[in-house]
Amino acid sequence: MSNSMTFQGVVEKGIGLGKKLGFPTFNLHVEPLPELAHGVYAVRARLGDASHGTGEVWHDALMHFGPKPTVSMESVFCEVYFLKFPEGLEIHELEVEVLGKLRDVMKFVGLDALVEQMKEDERVAVENYFRK
């Protein structure tokens, strides 16, 4: 996996909104923040840091990087949603590889519109990045 940006982050507890909307995310604390434009990205992520032998399998995922204007949260957030992920694992750290940007951060009129766009983001990512 070369010529792409990778970074690591520590998983922090969020407010649970992604899970409530059907898109459970891992909220990452990343320092320093990657030099990345705010937006939604197709990524691959794995548990922990490969250099420590804690994660061997890359998982297809989406990442939101930036503020969350629909819910009036203006700080920069880094959230990772796995398309398929085994349940029940306790995750403390993720390594993320950025594959490509899907779209800019947008403000939606409500949560229903946000969910519809998230479904579309997943469809576009699968078609353009994860099709096998």
Predicted features by range, described:
Residues 2-132:
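Phosphate/ribose-recognition catalytic cores of enzymes acting on nucleotide-derived substrates
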